[in-house]
Amino acid sequence: MSSFIDRILATRIRVKQIAKSVDEVHAVQDRIEQLLKDMQQNLPHEFESKAQAIQGKIDSQLQIDSQLQNVHLTKADTQLHLLQMARLFNDNLYHLIFHREEIQTLHQSVFPQFANQHEGREIAVVGCGPTLKQYQPIPGAVHIGVNKSFQHPALELDYLFIQDYVSSKGYIEAANQYRRGQCQKFYGIILGAYEISIPAIQAIAANAYRYYVMVGYSPFCQDIQNNPLPNFNSITFSALAFALLTKPKRIYLVGCDTNESGYFDGQLNHMAQADLMHSISINKQGWNHFKNFIDIFYPDIEIVSVNPVGLKGLFKDIYQ
């Protein structure tokens, strides 16, 4: 009898354990479903943009045969890049779901203070392309630079964005000391690529604000206080998203050359040719996405390309 009762008690305990496990599974499922519902409500434009960006990339890659002789791309290169695109999309979706609270917490502590900060003013977003050498600073404009643009002797930047530690190691310490108290730095954290993100010790040394950005494709959205900053293989898009937050009347694009000609300081781009052309293709898609985004959500902000090369004809062009 005792053995029978023991078996009954053991069975009861097992049933409770199973029930608890089922409850835990249901709780996880409920959490995932709620996260997906929140994303569906809050990020429809982002996911539609991601899908359009990837489809656009696929279309462009399928039409690439006519360009193969010029840039020496092979079918294997194209297939590899398409696989990389699919993997990046899945990785970004994962990080967006499971790091959403971290993104919101950080961005809500950083960006609200800058909303409408430069309303009605002119902003120059400064890249590092060769045409930066020709730029004559626009009087009275707020200057937002990226990467090593701060090394241009004629510039006095008000803001500086850096997010790729691999390419910035050679000048990050100089950036930390640049115009201290006058130029606010923003050092990015790349979700899924922490090994190339700016280390915390450098951000502390620069008194820099942190922000999150995704790898590769990450479209623009109006609410950067709750979402990652955009990225199309260029930090310029993060700087542009910040510029939009401040509500200027006009944004000048300086040194945003979007080609393989290297940098304003004479340094060349040492990427493999196939990878470079792939990166430029993503970058150009980003500019087209930005153009559509601006036309829909910020039609009152004028975008002007200064001494344009790769962006010629996309926005209003001026030459100095």
Per-segment meaning from a language model:
Residues 1-90:
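Boundary detector for helix-to-coil junctions that initiate low-complexity/charged tails
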Residues 73-320:
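Metal-ion/cofactor- or nucleotide/acyl-coenzyme-handling active-site neighborhoods
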